[in-house]
Amino acid sequence: MEIRPFDQAVHQHRTMSVRSATSSIPMDRSPEAHIETEMAALAAGFVNSTDRHVFLTGKAGTGKTTLLRRVVAGTHKRCVIVAPTGIAALNAGGVTIHSQFLLPFGTFVPERRLPAELVGSGRFHDRYTLDGRHPLNAVRRQVLRDLDLLVIDEVSMLRADVLDAIDHRMRVVRGRAGVPFGGVQLLLIGDLFQLPPVVKDEELQVLQRWYRSLHFFESLGLREAGYAHIELDRIFRQRDEVFVRVLNNLREDRVTADDIAVLNTRHRTQLSEEEREGLITLTTHNRTADELNSAAMRR
C-alpha cells in the first residue's frame, strides 16, 4: 500500500492503529489476510486519528470495498455512506448522493447566482436556488449537523459540480461557511480507471468556466481543502500471477501479444446448454440480455 502525501500522522499512529483495529477482525492466518488486515488497520487508523480528507484507490480486487466496511465498522466517528448510483449505494450499504442531500437533477454552478444567459433554462442550479427551491428537511439537516465522516463510494463517477453542491449543503447546514464541507471529513473511495463522470456536451461547455475537468478532484471545495491519497496495490481477488498481469495490462491499455495468447486459450466458439449453465453472458444491448434472462427463467 502506498500513501501520498505521507502525512506525519501515519508514522505517529501506525503501531497503535494496527493493534487496536485488528482486535475486532476475524483471524485468518494466511499471508494475504495478514497483509489485507494490516492495510485495513492502517487506513482505519489514519481516518480515525486525523481529520484529513482521504482518497482511497486501487485496482479491482485490491480490497477497497472490504476496507470501506472495516473502516466504517471500526470508526468512532458518526458516518454516512453515499454513492452516485443506486446500485453502487446498495453494494456499499448506503444511499444515493441525491437522496441524502436532496439535490435536484441538473447541473450545479458554483456561484451564488447563475450567469444571466443560464437563468430560466431549468437545467442549471446555483447556491441560491439550491437553498431556496430545494431545501433539506429537518431529518436530513440533523444528520448533517451530527456528521463527522462522509464516505463516498465509486467516486470515479462523481462529478466535480455535484461534490461542490455537497460542499455547499454542508457549509450552510453546519453554519461553517468558511470551512470546506462544513468541517466534515471525507473518505472518497474508487478507481479512476473505472467508470468516469457522465456529462453532456452542453453541460461541459458551461462548467469549463469553473472546472478543468469534471472529475471529483477538480471540485473547488476539495481543491481548497486538500486530501491524502492512499493506493492499495496488492490484488487479493486473483491468485494466478499470469492472469493478474493480463488484467493489469488491459486496465492500462498496454496489452501484449502474450496477453492475447493467454486470453485466446479460454476462447471457445461452441458450448452446449449444459456447459453454459452458471456462466455469465456479456451482451452489447439490454434487449439481448433481457431475452437470455427470460429464456433462463422459463427453463
Question: What residue spans do the PLM features occupy?
Answer:
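Conserved ATP-binding/catalytic motifs of P-loop helicase motor domains
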Residues: 2-299
